[in-house]
Curated annotation (Swiss-Prot):
Chief location of this protein within or outside the cell: periplasm
Residues involved in Mo-molybdopterin binding: 88, 91-92, 146, 181, 233, 238, 249-251
Taxonomic placement: Bacteria, Pseudomonadati, Pseudomonadota, Gammaproteobacteria, Enterobacterales
Sequence similarity: Belongs to the MsrP family.
Protein name: Protein-methionine-sulfoxide reductase catalytic subunit MsrP
GO cellular component, as recorded: periplasmic space
Length: 334
């Protein structure tokens, strides 16, 4: 396995840029800018968070047993754990980057049920313990690129999705894999209130082609930094597809269904001209409202360390995944 490219800059995207983008998205969804201030007065918290103002996180999970295969270890500079678990997009708990850490403690992750169904010979159900015990866990240091043009490097812990799908034995009719987040509005304020949840339709849904899901890079993720995922990172199990934008990494998954037809996906339903089904990281295909040519790496530095670095095609994983898209127009199929 070839090591992935990375440029060593340490910087953080200005919050004013995030607020502007979020307001534009919400306006497109029919939500007034004034509504942003209705449920939360926390918009001013984010800059203070980056300046070192401690904000309590949901409790860290239990330590996990895992291996560290050499193929997935590298010398990329890691994003500190407080930023990995304190700077998140998880609209079910609010729009601000700090909201998930502040609000996700309400999510009950044990007991948990994950069902695999659809075009499979052997449907199956996993419980909470199965997620960390049924498959050997391994740590993988992956780049993570948000569609908002910021990035992290994270030591995720999990198992390849293809191992889970193999147990279910996909039939010849299976062409796609559909994923669904838990729907629990009593625990997730963004599912109760469209202003808190960004006006999205819930539960959150995502999808991959079957060959993407079966790729060895695609990870069912149950931990980070040596411990079980905290709720704000998508506990107890989330998807990581490192060559795609972060919104493809659906969190708190309760359903995986293999299908004949391409499944709907949440952000594509909300704004199809802005968020495609594939969502492959591509510096040559801009978002309609901002460039994807560069990104800001969230590292150990503060907001005064701001510098951009070039975005890499397929987030630096082109050697491993480019063949999946041979002959596909990546501008049309963004």
């Amino acid at each position: 396995m070839k090591k992935n490219q990375f440029l060593k800059e340490s910087d953080v995207t200005a919050e004013s840029v995030f607020f502007m983008k979020r307001r534009q998205v919400l306006k497109a969804l029919g939500i007034s800018a004034a509504a942003l201030s209705l449920p939360h007065a926390a918009h001013a918290d984010l800059l203070s968070w980056f300046k070192g103002n401690d904000r309590p996180l949901a409790p860290a999970g239990k330590p996990l047993e895992f291996s560290k295969p050499a193929a997935w270890q590298n010398n990329l500079p890691l994003t500190p754990v407080d930023k990995v678990s304190g700077y998140n997009n998880f609209y079910e708990f609010g729009l601000d980057k700090a909201d998930p850490a502040a609000n996700a403690g309400s999510l009950k992750t044990d007991p948990w049920t994950l069902k695999i169904s659809g075009e499979v010979a052997k449907p199956l159900t996993l419980d909470h313990d199965d997620l960390t015990r049924r498959f050997p866990l391994e740590e993988r240091i992956y780049r993570m690129r948000c569609v908002e043009a910021w990035s992290m490097v994270v030591p995720w812990i999990g198992f390849p999705l293809h191992k889970l799908l193999a147990l279910a034995e996909p039939t010849s009719n299976a062409k796609y894999v559909a994923f669904e987040t838990i729907y629990a509005p009593e625990q997730m304020p963004g599912q109760q209130d469209r202003f808190i949840g960004g006006g999205l339709k819930y539960p959150y849904v995502e999808g991959l082609r079957l060959d993407e899901a079966m790729h060895p890079l695609t990870l069912m993720t149950v931990g980070v930094y040596g411990k079980a995922l905290p709720p704000q990172n998508g506990a107890p199990v989330r998807l990581i597809v490192p060559w795609k934008y972060g919104f493809k990494g659906i969190k708190s998954i309760v359903s995986i269904k293999l299908t004949r037809e391409r499944p709907p996906t949440t952000w594509n339903l909300a704004a199809p001209d802005e968020y495609g089904f594939y969502a492959n990281v591509n510096p040559h295909v801009d978002h309609p409202r901002w460039s994807q040519a560069t990104e800001r790496f969230i590292g150990s530095g503060g907001i005064l360390d701001v510098q951009r670095q070039p975005t890499l095609l397929f987030n630096g994983y082109a050697d491993q995944v480019a063949s999946l898209y041979r002959g596909l127009d990546l501008r049309e199929n963004f």
